[in-house]
């Protein structure tokens, strides 16, 4: 064989060997998925106010978590997208889940009750009520929360 024929054969073999062998290979190759910025998971639920946590799990602060419902059916589409997504929330549970709603920890397959998802949020709300306020302001805030005074009342 001549030198050009060998070169062409080598180039052909090289191009075949560097192909991506998984069925849903991302643009840029298999390793490029690690470098890609994570996007937010698809919105779902009533009024699209939640985020997908798994193929049939939709969670939002206002409604909790919906599993296997018509509102969570849209989350199955997430499996067909080539780039990974991040649902949000802090890590919780032993299965590598994320806090999805108040007191709920979800992974891609299920949701469980988790006190760590509840305690920090409640602590943050209590702390923000009193931060930087004198006692008169604190009493007014408490009365407004109880609905006993209007927010526009002056002293």
UniProtKB/Swiss-Prot annotation:
Cellular component annotations (GO), alphabetically ordered: extracellular space; secretory granule
Annotated InterPro entries: Neurhyp_horm, Neurhyp_horm_dom_sf, Neurohypophysial_hormone_CS
Keyword Disulfide bond: yes
The UniProt record lists the keyword Protein transport: no
Pfam families according to UniProt: Hormone_5
Post-translational modification: Seven disulfide bonds are present in neurophysin.
Protein name per UniProt: Isotocin-neurophysin IT 1
Organism expressing this protein natively: Takifugu rubripes
């Amino acid at each position: 064989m001549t030198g050009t024929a060998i070169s062409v054969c080598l180039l052909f073999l090289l191009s075949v060997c560097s192909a991506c062998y998984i069925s849903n290979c991302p643009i840029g190759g298999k390793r490029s998925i690690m470098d890609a910025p994570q996007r937010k998971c698809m919105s779902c639920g009533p009024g699209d106010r939640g985020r997908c946590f798994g193929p049939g799990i939709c969670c939002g602060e206002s409604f909790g978590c919906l599993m296997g419902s018509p509102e969570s059916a849209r989350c199955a589409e997430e499996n067909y997208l080539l780039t990974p997504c991040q649902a949000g929330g802090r890590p919780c549970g032993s299965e590598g889940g994320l806090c999805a709603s108040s007191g709920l920890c979800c992974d891609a397959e299920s949701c469980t009750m988790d006190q760590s998802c509840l305690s920090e949020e409640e602590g943050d709300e209590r702390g923000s009520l009193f931060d930087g306020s004198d006692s008169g302001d604190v009493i007014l805030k408490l009365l407004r929360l109880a609905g006993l005074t209007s927010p526009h009342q002056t002293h």
